[in-house]
Swiss-Prot record:
Post-translational modification: Nitrated mainly at Tyr-31 and, to a lower extent, at Tyr-26 and Tyr-134, in effective nodules and particularly in hypoxic conditions; this mechanism may play a protective role in the symbiosis by buffering toxic peroxynitrite NO(2)(-). Nitration level decrease during nodule senescence. Phosphorylation at Ser-46 disrupts the molecular environment of its porphyrin ring oxygen binding pocket, thus leading to a reduced oxygen consumption and to the delivery of oxygen O(2) to symbiosomes.
Subunit and interaction comment: Monomer.
Induction description: Negatively regulated by cobalt (Co) in a dose-dependent manner. Suppressed by exposure to excess nitrogen (N); this repression is associated with nodule greening and reduced biological nitrogen fixation (BN) efficiency.
Family label: Belongs to the plant globin family.
Encoding gene per record: LB2
Domain Globin stretches: 3-144
Xref: InterPro entries: Globin, Globin-like_sf, Globin/Proto, Leghaemoglobin-like, Leghaemoglobin_Fe_BS
Entry GO terms, CC: cytosol; nucleus
Localization per Swiss-Prot or TrEMBL: Cytoplasm, Cytosol; Nucleus
Protein residues bound to heme b: 46, 65, 93, 96
Protein name: Leghemoglobin 2
Amino acid sequence: MGAFTEKQEALVSSSFEAFKANIPQYSVVFYNSILEKAPAAKDLFSFLANGVDPTNPKLTGHAEKLFALVRDSAGQLKTNGTVVADAALVSIHAQKAVTDPQFVVVKEALLKTIKEAVGGNWSDELSSAWEVAYDELAAAIKKA
């Protein structure tokens, strides 16, 4: 991978703001997308026990945290050229034995959600910036 550019970081940051503009709606898009592709993922998220409920603060809080982590990864990539995952984040993913295919499902759901959040501003360049930031975060979680 080449250096993560200032433009890529700006694309991720600005589209994150579009996501934040309606977290309840986009949280539903995100988790429904995950559950459509991998219904068993419901067991990985305690707050999905009763389905996808946009009024559940744990659901919206987790979605916001995950998208913020990817945004922060973009910042780390721009500044340091690498992503360092938080030890607690690494621990929970190891404890739940999250697999490579599950990381892919989350990535696809993340991209679908951002695409919906930004509407007509979606582009290959925007998609690529989110993909790189997510992939580097996932790699940091898996290798730690």
